[in-house]
């Protein structure tokens, strides 16, 4: 069969061909491999036994991470190296793990989701990132890998022992990352005012947008914060805070999550406080209850509160 094109329609066909080719090129660039390109679901181990299997599960099945650069980084930064007990059972399961000092390392799907949300704000070079409540150092290491050799990452943590352990974990992973990573002992709520940041990651829940204002002030124009927001014993909202090139702030809530609270060192080390997770965890063969209680639903006026805060912070 021979297809004869109407001369009047040739420009249209040519334009459509260019658009189709552009779509395929873009799809190929965004795809990590043939499974993404053709939108084929890859079979994944639901009980991952390695970092690679874990990231495949998050990427192909749970679809918590889509950006290919984030996928590559998550495969490079081995979660097991950052756990308190290197012999912990099921280190690659998608669940939070205790790391001591009443702190936890978040579930892998939360790391994946939050880093994915930051992906398009990571500069090609000379970027600066801030990791608040760096804890195990896992996300700090991921940010160090993502920012590249010209970038800089600041991790703020108020438990010195966790910082020491983070440094040792990164040394085992890739000691050259420490050339661009700096850990500081301090109160993460205040950030670190000596720098302005392209991206800010909060690994614990900040009480309110008002409390987060100091962090928003430290964001560069064109930058982004991803953070859980809410009171310590509530569910939290995962929020994305963007500052455009003119310095105008916009905020979006992406839904309900549950994190440990961003709190003082004294409160965190108080033996009456428990990690803010809601599940039974198997630790060294012994099942341990890590808090289980009825929690109020998030504020139904959330969108109104966000709009009010946007108006306040953008007021000239």
UniProtKB/Swiss-Prot annotation:
Protein residues bound to S-adenosyl-L-homocysteine: 103-106, 111, 136, 157-158, 187-188, 263, 268
UniProt-listed InterPro entries: PCMT, SAM-dependent_MTases_sf
List of catalytic residues: 106
GO biological process: methylation; protein modification process
Record-level Gene Ontology MF annotations: protein-L-isoaspartate (D-aspartate) O-methyltransferase activity
Domain of life: Eukaryota
Disulphide bridges: none
PANTHER family the UniProt entry points to: PROTEIN-L-ISOASPARTATE O-METHYLTRANSFERASE (PTHR11579), PROTEIN-L-ISOASPARTATE(D-ASPARTATE) O-METHYLTRANSFERASE (PTHR11579:SF0)
NCBIfam families, alphabetized: pimt
Identification of the protein by name: Probable protein-L-isoaspartate O-methyltransferase
